[in-house]
Amino acid sequence: MAKAATIKIKLLSTADTGFFYVTKKNSRTMTDKMSKRKYDPIVKKHVEFKETKIK
């Protein structure tokens, strides 16, 4: 059986609110850490979210 190409990751807010999104990425094409600007409802702003592992 083949290994799955997509893995689940957690995007954690850099505003230190503890808010996170769970998304998936293709681990074969995106080998570096993912970061996106998304909305953090706790601070009510768009902030940078960085990839961390799901524990």
From Swiss-Prot:
GO terms for MF: structural constituent of ribosome
Phylogenetic classification of the source organism: Bacteria, Pseudomonadati, Pseudomonadota, Alphaproteobacteria, Hyphomicrobiales
Family annotation (NCBIfam families): PRK00595.1, rpmG_bact
Protein name, as recorded: Large ribosomal subunit protein bL33
Record organism: Bartonella bacilliformis (strain ATCC 35685 / KC583 / Herrer 020/F12,63)
Keyword Ribonucleoprotein part of the UniProt annotation: yes
Designated gene of the protein: rpmG
Pfam families: Ribosomal_L33 (PF00471)
Similarity field: Belongs to the bacterial ribosomal protein bL33 family.
InterPro entries: Ribosomal_bL33 (IPR001705), Ribosomal_bL33_CS (IPR018264), Ribosomal_bL33_sf (IPR038584), Ribosomal_zn-bd (IPR011332)
Superkingdom of source: Bacteria
